[in-house]
């Protein structure tokens, strides 16, 4: 701000009238190397927050719930997918398999991968009832939208209308259960990170003993 007037911050980046900086500093998002590097977990957090924001907009009558249900549900689904991909990567790192996640949008396959990898570690990083509840919620979502397309387009690639058999979706009910799922998955991510740190400490100490 200069003499009470907000001005754009100087920034060295390619010119683009859409994706550029603005005078309101609080609304300038830090991206790329300026804000990260971000990982799948960070992106997932953003999509969960996006889902919550869409529901809040409906609650505040900023936008019609009949329209906001689509970006809300899509954001939640993508947030789940990104969290699961992050977990697959993290658990593979613990197991030192050298592998990562499949680059597709099959949420239930990602979940099965998480379960298998977690079992292979031989140590419970999160309580069993939490795993069961997460699996239940992911299963419900996958049964409703197995392809990740249901809330993106009104029809599938064959012209069949999505949601033809359904009449109502309460976005607050959806939000509350997505918040519950998010909490479980985030704890799992943090527990996996803590276990990896412990694992590296063990490797380091064993190396020191041999020396």
Placement of each model-derived feature along the sequence:
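Domain-scale activation on soluble regions of proteins
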Residues: 1-211
